[in-house]
Amino acid sequence: MSNNKKEIMKFYTMPETRAFLESIGMPGGDLYDLPTSEKRFPDGGQYRFEVPGIQGPGPMKALLEALDEYGIQIHRVTQTKGIMFLTDEEISKMVEYAKKWNVQLVLACGPRATTDTSASVKTEEGQRMGYRLRGEEQIARGIEEIRRGARLGVRGFLIYDEGLLWALNEARKNGFIPADCHFKVSAHSGHGNPCSAHILETIGADSINPIRDIQIQMLAAMRAAIDVPIDLHTENPKSSGGFIRHYEVPDFIRVAAPVYLKTGGSVAANHSYDTTEKEARQRAKQIMLVKRVIDTYYPEAVVSPKITK
């Protein structure tokens, strides 16, 4: 073999690529040794509970009352259809319930690819664009959504587009929206690796929801790259695969803390499903089932006190 070929083969070795990734502050690959995360929420907690897909005040109240009956606390309630689908009165009522039960309320930005006039997103190929926004007009409308929610007392917002996230972070820094606004990046943005998560963190994400089927070793690598909380689905609606990950939750907590455990999704048919009050109570039961797994297999795990920050 010529010296030239030897040099080429040496140059393209995987160890060098892994070393380069580590030199720029990223893990060199997925962390199969599953290291325990020492990172925590500010209160010292490793995990918090989140219930997604609560689209209005009726289901929200039913959920929180059912949780009281079970004696279980949660920390975050998330609406996914969009602020533009709620009246001012409905938003104000949800803010009222969030204060009464001391949970963080997260409302979704309404404008997205699936509600735009574009035909592309309805096609097999176009679906790959996810919920991302098309055109600057949609960015402006997205900012208006967040401003409206903020005026009504909302501070947590679910974001689907990286450009909108960046613009909102600039708005937050410049005082155009309240400085205490919290931006949660949706799993529908399609991120599933440490480098992507790092980008989201640098442009303003306060918590990141990776793709739903991310594996434990991938999750460990993501945690090594970022400090913000990671939001993880413990179960999923049929439209997202329908898989249940309850027995993986102890490992979620151990390798990825601080984490929000998104629970109750298996009750829904799809992402923007209108959960009924009866189904909201079923979601409360799912929280109890996940808590049982944690208490059995990782009893030393520390849950955050019931706070909203």
Regions found by a protein language model. Name each.
Residues 2-154, 159-191, 209, 216-309:
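Active-site pocket-lining/capping segments in soluble small-molecule metabolic enzymes
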Residues 192-196:
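Short, glycine/polar-rich helix-capping loops at beta-to-alpha or helix-loop-helix junctions
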Residues 198-201:
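Acidic/histidine-rich catalytic cores of soluble enzymes
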Residues 203-206:
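Hydrophobic, aromatic-enriched interface-forming segments
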